From Swiss-Prot:
Protein name, per record: Mitogen-activated protein kinase HOG2
DNA-binding found in the keyword field: no
Keyword Metal-binding: no
Recorded name of the encoding gene: HOG2
Root EC class: transferase
EC number: 2.7.11.24
Amino acid sequence: MATHEEFIRTQVFGTVFEITNRYTDLNPVGMGAFGLVCSATDTLVGQPVAIKKIMKPFSTAVLAKRTYRELKLLKHLRHENLICLQDIFLSPLEDIYFVTELQGTDLHRLLQTRPLEKQFVQYFLYQILRGLKYVHSAGVIHRDLKPSNILINENCDLKICDFGLARIQDPQMTGYVSTRYYRAPEIMLTWQKYDVEVDIWSAGCIFSEMIEGKPLFPGKDHVHQFSIITDLLGSPPRDVINTICSENTLKFVTSLPHRDPVPFQERFKTVEPDAVDLLRRMLVFVPKKRITAADALVHPYLAPYHDPTDEPTAEAQFDWDFNDADLPVDTWRVMMYSEILDFHKIGGGDGQIDTNAAFDDQVAAAHAAAMAQHHHQTQQQSSGKHTNPTTSSSAATITVTVPIAITMPSLIMVIKRFTT
């Protein structure tokens, strides 16, 4: 049964937030480079949600492509330890809004409040690696894994978020994106050659931070970051140096004095041996020698939670055919409308709530208008005329549960404080 929804406009941190009346109790929870995130209540199901506004997604082809990539990934990647897309809509101002589950806090904020007990370090690392096993099996690299991109609720359920920078598993990459503290050395040294192992390095840095309560490699800049990595791991081996493409970087690395590695058992003297062994296998200079997410899950340190029957891989590889395309904004707009329409046609993945009839008509009309506009512009590229179709939406909801749970009142109370 279709429902009628209207858009309500409000100001949040000086930013116009334009959402349907299905969502109430809007409160800001975070601001990123590409959008604003607010908490809200989904009145249709009576549950809290997070709403991320992508501001001016069609202002440039680069931003349109990035938004399209994030939407495609959120639709494709469906796993208990990954943030789940519950709704998506376009406002009359043509901003795009992603609606996901609302988690109580993130790991960065949690680590600032208190040290974590051993069982929480184990359980959180297990869930991170469980999610990465799935992501990597889909042919995807997260590329920006860090504590602030790891969300946690009061049941200690963990979800990895922010796939806007994720990329294909391609041996030829350009640029580096991850936050410095969690950046793998091959990104700093080669820039163009890296794979899923960069996520394992980031997870290892996060693992150490959960153990010690502070970043393992808090570099002040690019040079200092590399220097403190070599303080622990020693000088990079020859097979790493041979991959350096930049002449300046090569000169810098080869000019450094030789450093011997520090045994992990010596660096982490008070940490249990199994934890030190797993950390040592994650933080390896040579990417292909790092432990994989799948192998890490069977390590003795994670034995309390490891379940080979409940650590799924992706059913299909993610389709990256669009990723190398250099398309105009209006083509990305057409593709975006198609993806949004498809999301609502399949009920957000489970079809539990059928409120899509009105949305189908409205977005289909907008899609048809965009298609007509795109066709017109391909016929008359010199005209420079643009139209801005608008639309509203109904929505669908998906419910996700995690079968594993542990509790400790002290930590749960800390997480709850972030939600009140």
